[in-house]
């Protein structure tokens, strides 16, 4: 973030985050073919990596207090229109009703494990889904450094 801000001092930085437990379970249960994501196939590594990320984003938020827009995934899916309007305002962009129709506007292919989700309307079923695993993963959840 420091590098980006140095070369693009007027840039807008958006940090989208979600519930730590949901994030951890999602990372672990999805297969990522990239060698850069090898750590996500091990719960201990996933917790360590998440905690490094959490520390790093806290550092950058302290360095650039008003420069980073922190967008909660849970808030985005529960109040999409209002949250998207806030995000657009931060980016100095105008509201367009198509912002809520993203799933109908694909013109280019996307390569992500979330391909099917990206082509659906915004949905809430992934919020707090980690509770289904809490009995089995409590020791890992307890080690997560929450962002909020």
What are these regions (language model features)?
Residues 1:
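Conserved adenosine/adenylate-binding substructure
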Residues 4, 8-29:
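Conserved phosphate-donor/acceptor-positioning beta-strand/loop module used by diverse small-molecule
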Residues 20-21, 75-78:
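Short, glycine-/Ser/Thr-/acidic-enriched flexible segments
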Residues 15, 70-72:
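Structural signal for conserved beta-strand scaffold positions within catalytic alpha/beta enzyme cores
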Residues 7, 27-70, 77-148:
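PAPS-dependent sulfotransferases, especially Golgi type II membrane carbohydrate sulfotransferases
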């Amino acid at each position: 973030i420091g590098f980006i801000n140095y070369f693009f001092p007027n840039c807008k930085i958006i940090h989208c985050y979600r519930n730590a437990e949901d994030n951890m379970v999602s990372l672990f249960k999805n297969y990522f073919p990239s060698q850069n994501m090898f750590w996500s196939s091990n719960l201990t590594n996933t917790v360590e990596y998440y905690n490094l990320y959490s520390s790093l984003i806290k550092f950058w938020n302290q360095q650039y207090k008003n420069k980073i827009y922190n967008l909660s995934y849970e808030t985005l899916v529960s109040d999409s229109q209002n949250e998207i309007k806030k995000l657009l305002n931060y980016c100095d962009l105008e509201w367009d009703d198509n912002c809520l129709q993203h799933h109908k506007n694909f013109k280019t292919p996307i390569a992500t494990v979330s391909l099917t989700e990206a082509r659906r309307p915004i949905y809430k079923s992934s919020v707090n889904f980690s509770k289904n695993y809490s009995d089995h993963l409590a020791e890992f959840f307890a080690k997560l450094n929450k962002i909020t």
